[in-house]
Structures are given as C-alpha cells and as structure tokens.
C-alpha cells in the first residue's frame, strides 16, 4: 500500500543540497533502509521519546524485526525528563509494558542538566534531582527496566551530566555492554520539521557508506534517521493503515 507518492532523496550538487523526488514511496524506502541497518550493524536500539515520530519508527522497526529477524532483540531507550505531559507518560508506560518481553527496555530516569527558560536565577533544571525528591513533578516509575541512581548499569554516566551527553553516553555504554560491536541508534527525526533538523540529517562529512542519514558518534557507534524524508501526513497515514498505537496528545 502506498503511504506517499514520492520518497525524498537528498543529494549534493554544486556544493549545495537539493531534494530529488523518485518513484519510490516512503514506506518502501524505510524498508530498504531498515534492511541496510540490520545487515550492517550488530547492535540496534531505538531512541523513543514518546512522541509521534519516534513512536512510528519504533513500530516500523519492530514490524521489520519480527518479520525478518525474529531471533534478534533490539533495544529501546527512553530518556525521561520528569516534567512531561501526562498523556506522553501514559503512552510510554503502555508501550514499554506491551513490548518489554520482545525488546531490551531502558527507561532512564537519571539526574541530568537540562536548560530551562523558567528561571531568572538558574540556567539548568535537573530532572530526577535526588537532592530534591520532595519537589519531583511526579513519582519515579517503578519497573525492573527503569534506570535510576539506585539501579544504574550505565558505567558511562556522570552525575548531572548534560542531557545531550547522557543520550550519547548511553549509546557508548550500549556498545560496550553488547560486546563492543558496531552499534547504531535509530532516531525518529524528519527533515521537514525544521531547517535545523534538515541540516542535521544532511551529513556530508561523517556519513556511513555514502548514506547521508547515518552519522558517526564514536568509534563503531552511529546514529541513523530512517524516516528522515517522511512528512507529517505520512506519519498519520501509517498509524491509520497499520493500526499503530500513538501518543494521543498529538
């Protein structure tokens, strides 16, 4: 079934980036990319924020894995910022409960430095600050797969590290804890969300085997954006066609 008429292929011409439309639809394109990922990388995990894009990517990746690699487990990483919409937390909660026996689940609730615009006196806010438990916006989730200060296998974590560094160091720890083999983190970012996302995806210098949607983080650790050319309508079309669960906030 066609999800979109065209796949957007991003290429370089005369030192500038351009969009080139092809006859391949975005669903066919993401199947091809997932095949490439599963063939190229030993360790695969999805960064699942609880948003509509990462949720769609998680569902697509699981469908592909169940069909073609039934004996291979993927990881699912959720970075919990404590103060988030209740509907988002409910979606993350039911997703983890649904897939916990099929994947390696990692629900991370560690103190981290997050920039805040809500204070005139502090530059950073620290979700899950262990020194201010009485001020927590919500209670710590209580599941075996929750990573917090009392249960933290992440040897690359540093107390109150920047939120961006925490995500990167999770990738590094995932690689270390899985035999130091070639590892990729799948991100649900799309080029049409913003110029910043567009520029982030168009990697001219550190792409993997001429694929601009895969970028290097560390030695043998990569990040990939398999749905980079999907539109907002493609996301909802897929959710409808495949009857996927999604974050009702959207």
Can you describe what each PLM-predicted range is?
Residues 5-234:
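ATP-dependent adenylation/nucleotidyltransferase module used to activate substrates
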Residues 226-250:
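Mid-to-C-terminal catalytic subdomains of enzymes
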């Amino acid at each position: 079934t066609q999800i979109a008429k065209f796949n957007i292929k991003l290429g370089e011409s005369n030192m500038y980036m351009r969009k080139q439309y092809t006859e391949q639809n975005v669903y066919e394109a993401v199947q091809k990319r997932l095949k490439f990922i599963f063939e190229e990388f030993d360790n695969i995990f999805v960064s699942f924020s609880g948003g509509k894009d990462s949720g769609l990517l998680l569902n697509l990746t699981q469908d592909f894995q169940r069909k073609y690699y039934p004996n291979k487990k993927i990881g699912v990483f959720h970075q919990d910022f404590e103060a988030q919409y209740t509907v988002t937390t409910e979606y993350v909660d039911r997703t983890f409960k649904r897939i916990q026996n099929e994947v390696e689940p990692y629900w991370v609730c560690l103190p981290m430095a997050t920039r805040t615009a809500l204070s005139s006196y502090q530059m950073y806010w620290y979700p899950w600050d262990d020194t201010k438990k009485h001020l927590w916006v919500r209670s710590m989730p209580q599941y075996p797969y929750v990573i917090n200060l009392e249960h933290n296998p992440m040897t690359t974590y540093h107390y109150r590290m920047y939120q961006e560094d925490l995500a990167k160091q999770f990738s590094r720890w995932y690689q270390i804890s899985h035999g130091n083999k070639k590892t990729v983190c799948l991100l649900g970012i799309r080029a049409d969300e913003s110029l910043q996302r567009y520029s982030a995806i168009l990697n001219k210098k550190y792409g993997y085997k001429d694929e601009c949607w895969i970028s290097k983080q560390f030695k043998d650790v990569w990040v990939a954006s398999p749905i980079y050319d999907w539109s907002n309508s493609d996301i909802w079309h897929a959710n409808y066609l495949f009857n996927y669960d999604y974050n009702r906030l959207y």
